């Protein structure tokens, strides 16, 4: 597994459809609607929190990928087989990914949690026994985001 450094900034994103995991694995990208995007996509890694659509893997983080960059595109450019989708013309971030990596130890949620994105660090991800262990204090999250944007905290 590619080494995760303690200070790496990791975006945890909710993945609701097994098709999206296959796209990440085979095509090397993940989509995020601009209207719901997190504060920054300038992160080192993206980890995927799997919902109930993933059966036995539900409510856990099992996969992550190094983020190589991102670009702005229309949904119809990403999913060409859905030209008539209601959001076909809406802007999305296409996050380019390195190879999908499976965690040696999944990070479960002891109970159902509702969130879209959260930021954590490499240190917290490696040490986590449960999703709540990923939480970074708000002041530390602010410092990490400012660092990624090239601003002093």
Label every model-predicted segment.
Residues 2-153:
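Structured alpha/beta reader/binder surfaces that contact nucleic acids or chromatin modification marks
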